[in-house]
């Protein structure tokens, strides 16, 4: 997929022109927790990027994020519970998809079909078939799409790849990998319960098979 238009690692050449109203990049964030919010914060480092819409299935998250965004940028975004309403807006140039994985494919292809460029969080999708469809939509609609895969966009990683490919290190016989955190805590079972007020759990499930809510 083509390089994205949003992340701070993007070359400055793309924006090396006088800034006017038509030079603004209007962005919508779909999925306002965690990585989605982090991605938006990175995008807003660029003065030509402004967030005009937020979308989430949790009304409380929406309201909190909208208030924070207005404090930071002075712009009051329009709030949505259904991403399809976001894609109807002609003034939105690009979307950031920070939803759970099972939504990535449908939201990304719908965004491409609606004429939006896309930054979609990792993992790209849940199957090779979904990935194939996403690539096909990006190519058919000629959209700029980037996957939020860490250590892929920065120039330092491209230089490292070139260095490894050059053979300067010789034959690599062993690679050590480590992590400084553990996912063990998420293995603890949580009892099913009723979705809290303000959360549209059916919309959260979307294309996924039905299952009861738990926190």
Model-flagged regions — what are they?
Residues 183-186, 210-215:
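Pol beta-like nucleotidyltransferase catalytic core
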Residues 117, 125-203:
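A contiguous active-site-proximal alpha/beta segment in oxidoreductase catalytic domains
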Residues 85, 206-213:
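Glycine-rich, acidic and aromatic/proline-enriched surface loops and short helix-turn segments
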Residues 46, 81, 152-153, 211-213:
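Redox-cofactor-proximal catalytic regions of oxidoreductases
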């Amino acid at each position: 997929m083509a390089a994205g238009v949003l992340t701070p690692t993007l070359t400055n050449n793309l924006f090396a022109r006088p800034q006017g109203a038509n030079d603004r990049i209007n962005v919508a964030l779909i999925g306002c927790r965690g990585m989605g919010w982090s991605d938006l914060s990175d995008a807003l480092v660029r003065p030509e990027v402004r967030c005009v819409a937020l979308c989430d299935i949790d009304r409380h998250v929406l309201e909190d994020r909208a208030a924070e965004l207005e404090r930071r940028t002075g712009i009051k975004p329009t709030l949505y519970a259904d991403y399809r309403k976001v894609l109807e807006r002609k003034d939105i140039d690009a979307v950031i998809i920070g939803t759970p994985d099972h939504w990535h494919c449908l939201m990304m292809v719908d965004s491409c079909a609606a004429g939006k460029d896309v930054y979609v969080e990792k993992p790209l999708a849940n199957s090779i078939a979904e990935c194939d469809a996403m690539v096909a939509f990006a190519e058919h609609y000629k959209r700029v799409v980037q996957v939020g895969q860490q250590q892929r966009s920065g120039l330092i990683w491209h230089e490292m790849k070139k260095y490894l490919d050059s053979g300067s290190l010789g034959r690599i016989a062993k690679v050590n990998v480590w992590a400084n955190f553990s996912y063990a805590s998420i293995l603890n079972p949580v009892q099913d319960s009723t979705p809290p007020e303000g959360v549209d759990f059916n919309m959260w499930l979307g294309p996924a098979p039905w299952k009861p809510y738990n926190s």
